[in-house]
Every structure is written in structure tokens, then in C-alpha cells.
């Protein structure tokens, strides 16, 4: 088999791309993944779901701790800066990336960094790189974006979506 030819190439390393790649590999297929971010995991890991949920969970824990009479009797309420809480979310993202990277490495699935562009029905190139890959089949799992309902001003400084909530500074 040629070095840059695979049974299946998965474009995207988020949850759907990861599942497709792992399932194909478990069925004995040669698989490669194209990832347009510096690290695997897609927007779910880096922008939206995981970091925003980690942030929300951390804030809820601090609030519950400070509201719990058992802990209140121990002294003053715990004060954590927003930056400390954001660092926790960053740590969660780091752990997710490491775990997902280990999945790919353990299953011997190569990751190619870059954005894919089809040259024909069996060939893609990595944009900005001199790399072409071929496959018998492709899975396009490029993810989604936050929904912005009409009538909500997302340019307002106090309105955030799951991709921008981590840009808060306080």
C-alpha cells in the first residue's frame, strides 16, 4: 500500500470524526485523520462543549461550597479569581487532548495537520502544504457552530455563546 493512501480518511477530529476513525480502525481499515487545529479534539474540546461545561461546573462548585452551611461554619467564603477558574477549564481541555491523542497513537491512526481540499473523488490536498493523500472513502466530520437565534445581539458585550464564553476576563 502506498504511504499516503488509506482505506478511509476522516476530515475532522471532534467526537464524530474520532468515532468514525476508531470504528473503521477496529474493523481493520487503514485510517488517517485530518485535523485543522493544532491539537485533536475539534471545537467540542477546544472552544465549545468541554471548556464551557468545565467552566460552568467550576463556578457551580464554588457557589455550592460557599452556600453550604457545613462549610460556611469553617470560616469565610472561598474566593477564587475568574482566572483561577479559567485555568481549571484549561486543565480539563489539556487532559482531554492528551487522552484523545493517546487514542489515535495507540490505534496507530496518523493525524495530518491542516485543512483538506478535494482534488478529485479519491484525492485531497492539505491547503498550504505540499501534501496529497488518497483514500477509497472519506468521512467529512467537520463539526458545527453555535446557534445564534435571530433577535439576539451577539455583538453585545454581555452576550456570549459557547465559543466566546472563555474570552471573559472577569
What residues fall within each predicted segment?
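The conserved SAM/SAH-binding core of class I Rossmann-like methyltransferase domains
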Residues: 11, 34-35
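Glycine-rich flavin
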Residues: 3-6, 22-29, 35-170
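N-terminal Rossmann-fold NAD(P) dinucleotide-binding loop
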Residues: 17-18
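Beta1/beta-strand and adjacent pyrophosphate-binding region of the FAD-binding site
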Residues: 2-14
